[in-house]
Swiss-Prot record:
This is Small ribosomal subunit protein uS10. One of its GO terms (molecular function) is structural constituent of ribosome. The gene is rpsJ. It comes from Hydrogenovibrio crunogenus (strain DSM 25203 / XCL-2). Keywords: Ribonucleoprotein, Ribosomal protein. Gene3D superfamilies: Ribosomal protein S10 domain.
């Protein structure tokens, strides 16, 4: 597995959770002897929603909401078997979406 890389994509609505998860992944990978590139912050996706407040009249009365999706990218170079096992056993926060890709 010396020629393979692991690319990890993290997504979350809370930037503190995603930074904490990225820190845990980098510490775990470095502890097992792998080299880590990142975390690289990717552009934040902002979804905006406009909702009418009144059910009948007053079209000018509206509320606006926003959901921000934060993303981070990590590359683990030259992972060992211990690195893969440690990453699979790692328990991350519930609000973080993790995607692993072997390259």
């Amino acid at each position: 597995m010396a020629t393979q890389n692991i690319r990890i994509r993290l997504k979350a609505f809370d930037h503190r959770l995603i930074d904490q998860s990225a820190r845990e992944i980098t510490e775990t990978a470095k502890r097992t002897g792998a080299q880590v590139k990142g975390p690289i912050p990717m552009p934040t996706r902002k979804e905006r929603f406009t909702v009418l407040v009144s059910p009948h009249v007053n079209k000018d009365a509206r509320d606006q909401y926003e959901i921000r999706t934060h993303k981070r990218l990590l590359d683990i170079v030259d992972p060992t078997d211990k690195t893969v096992d440690a990453l699979m056993k790692l328990d991350l926060a519930a609000g973080v979406d993790v995607q692993l890709e072997l390259r």
